[in-house]
Amino acid sequence: MNEATPKAPGPRSLQRATRRPVRVPGADAVTIGFLPEAPSTPALVTPDGPGVDLPGWLRSNRDAVEARLLRHGAILLRGFHRGSVEKFEQAASAVCGTLFREYGDLPREGESERVYKSTPYPEDLSILFHNESSHLPQWPMRQFFSCIVAPHTGGQTPIVDCRTVLDRMRPELAELFATKKLRYVRNFIDGVDVSWSRFFGTDDPAEVERKCAEEGTSFEWTPDGGLRTSRQAEAVLRHPVTGEAVFFNQLALHHPSSLDPETRSSLLAICGDQGMPRNVFWGDGSVIDDAVVTEVRDLMDRESVAFTWQEGDVLVIDNMLVAHSRSPFTGPRKIVVALGDMTGGSVPTLSSVSSV
């Protein structure tokens, strides 16, 4: 795949880019194009014939794959092999080298230490848009998904370009996110969500305290043996490679308005704002109005694209350029996940979006 490295354009440039499939000749010939239902992202790569080894192809074309990711934010690799956790891990490793193996927010896939199951959540509910680990001091620049078993209906993993989201957000609201930032408050309660021991990878409270102090996360042990953490994080960042401003956070996923009204009312009555399993505030601790979250959520939904999973599909995303979600589904569904190129701390921040 001897492609010149393409310059990464902004979201408006993406809309003007050609959408005709391009055949890349060679021993492992592939065609690069787009899905009819998703004309700007993800880029679709399919083999021109049988026998193209996906991990080998990715290793041979790593620079071109990286350039495509920076341009489109996501790549869908389809038709290379049947659903296989082993092949998936090899493919992800071909792109990133070392995969992250200490992520406490996802259950580990039993076949591998570097592959995770997707988020366990009721099949009839949506998981809202978020950038993986954007509420934490470290996050993966690359996230991989693969379909091992396709659901009967639904179960898509919609994606949305975070450059476009910021570009089309009301300027006043974008400025608020850049200047006020966000504060994530999390309560680790036995039997609700993930436990603090699994999240931190230790049963030792002293080790948890050490990790929190190292990450700049405030913490408090509750009388019932639970743990409350609070951490301020950016809502808008600059991509460290392209320099583009991106809307990068877990606002929709953590805000109480993401819950159904009955569950939200019950949890608030029992726990209060500060006792919810997950919550997000403005950086100064003030409450974010539901209307703000609804506006952002509606914008992300409008700009999103989705495709139907096929067994063996591998989706690669730039976790800062693209946010993802999950649609409700019926039937068995097995989507596995891998994370790579961990970063954080040195990523450029924005004190204002007025000059973007």
Locations of the language-model features?
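Active-site environment of non-heme Fe oxygenases that use a 2-His-1-carboxylate facial triad
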Residues: N2-G56, R68-L70, E123-F129, Q138-V314, ...
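Basic- and aromatic-enriched surface patches that contact anionic nucleotides/nucleic acids
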Residues: H135
